[in-house]
Amino acid sequence: MTMSTEIAAELKIARLRYAGNEAFVAESPSGHAVVTGFAHEGLSSPTPMELLLIALGGCTGADVVGILEKKRQVVTSYEIEVRGTRRAEHPRIYTRIEVVHRVQGRNVDPKAVARAVELSETKYCSVSAMLSAGTEIVSSFEVVEEEGPRI
C-alpha cells in the first residue's frame, strides 16, 4: 500500500451548500444533514462553534457509555454539559472547555466513571484530541445513586 492510498483511506469529505441568510446545509461524510450558520434572527440551528461543543460531548459520551458498559456499571441516566469560553478577539476560539459528566445509576463506582472519563479524554475521543491541541479542556464528573425499583 502506498502512502497516498493510506491517506486516502482516511479522507472524509463534508459538503456544505449555501442556503441563504448566512446559513448552510451540510452533509456529513456519513450522509447526515445538518443546518448551521451564524446566530441571528431567523436561524434556528447551531452555529459552527456550538457544533464543536456538541461534537466533543457526543464523542466523549459515546466513549464513557461504552467503557462503563464493559465495566458492568448500571447507568440509568447520563448527561453531559459542555461549557466553552471564547476569547474576545478574532478569531474567537475556545480558550477553555469544561466537560461535566453526570452519571446516575445503581451502585455506580466513582472510580469506574473517573477511569472512563480519563480514557475518553486521553486515548479514545478524537474530538478531544483535536481541540486539546489549542484549548484547555477540563473534565469532571458527578455520580448520583438511583433510588427506587430497578428498571
Segments (PLM) and residue ranges:
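Extended beta-strand/beta-hairpin segments
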Residues: 1-54, 65-151
